[in-house]
From Swiss-Prot:
Protein family per UniProt: Belongs to the APS kinase family.
ATP-binding as UniProt keyword: yes
Stated name of the protein: Adenylyl-sulfate kinase
Cited function: Catalyzes the synthesis of activated sulfate.
Recorded metabolic or biological pathway in which this protein acts: Sulfur metabolism; hydrogen sulfide biosynthesis; sulfite from sulfate: step 2/3
NCBIfam families given in the database record: apsK, PRK03846.1
Gene responsible for this protein: cysC
GO molecular function, one term: adenylylsulfate kinase activity
Residues engaged in binding ATP: G31, L32, S33, G34, S35, G36, K37, S38
GO BP annotation list: hydrogen sulfide biosynthetic process; sulfate assimilation
Catalytic activity: adenosine 5'-phosphosulfate + ATP = 3'-phosphoadenylyl sulfate + ADP + H(+)
Keyword Transferase applies: yes
Length: 205
């Protein structure tokens, strides 16, 4: 039997959420490199923040500067990377925040493992379904060129698979329509499921 026990605090997550006037959730943006995950998540966070919501964006590149800087890109390391991010996101949701995360997260198993950490309705999977042809044409970091040249091994979409979500709450192709329209669709969805108050939302659009 473990000597480590869970310490129950006097302030629970519902109290923290009530103080902030919002329903905390995790929006998990998944898709290929260059699909527009970070751009879309960042624009949504800006809209929510400007309307007075308490948010935080976890970005795949940023966490590797600190939390996950000891990890590489092997299958095991990528799995551990997402495990850590999922646990951090859970703490943030417990703190009452609307959390946005932008990670390739290529396998259904990885994504479902993170989903299992959260209460029903608190994990919203957003599949950024931009076609690989568009992602490769964008190639903002030059990664596709390196992968095609064999300089990057196990690159998702080229030499490693991406498992398309089968039950994502939302699917957005960033090659169709403009960013403002896509953000508005996300805001409308969050209002419809009563994650955010529609009156506060009016300030964000």
């Amino acid at each position: 039997m473990s000597d480590i026990v869970w310490h129950q605090h006097s302030i629970d997550k519902q109290s923290r959420a009530d103080q902030k006037g919002q329903n905390p959730i995790l929006l998990w943006f998944t898709g290929l490199s260059g699909s527009g995950k970070s751009t879309l998540a960042g624009a949504l966070e800006r809209a929510l923040f400007d309307a007075g919501f308490h948010t935080y964006l976890l970005d795949g590149d940023n966490v590797r500067h600190g939390l996950c800087k000891d990890l590489g890109f092997s299958a095991d390391d990528r799995d551990e990377n997402l495990r850590r991010v999922g646990e951090v996101a859970k703490l943030m949701v417990d703190a009452g925040l609307v959390v946005l995360s932008a990670f390739i997260s290529p396998t259904r198993e990885e994504r479902e493992r993170v989903r299992a950490l959260f209460d029903q309705g608190q994990f919203i999977e957003v599949h950024v379904s931009t076609p690989i042809e568009v992602c490769e044409a964008r190639d903002p970091k030059g990664l596709y060129s390196k992968a095609r040249a064999g300089e990057i091994k196990n690159f998702t979409g080229i030499s490693a698979p991406y498992e398309t979500p089968t039950a994502a709450e939302l699917t957005i192709d960033t090659s169709k329509g403009d960013l403002a329209t896509q953000v508005s669709a996300l805001l409308d969805y969050l209002a419809a499921i009563q994650v955010i108050d529609s009156e506060k939302l009016k300030k964000a659009v």
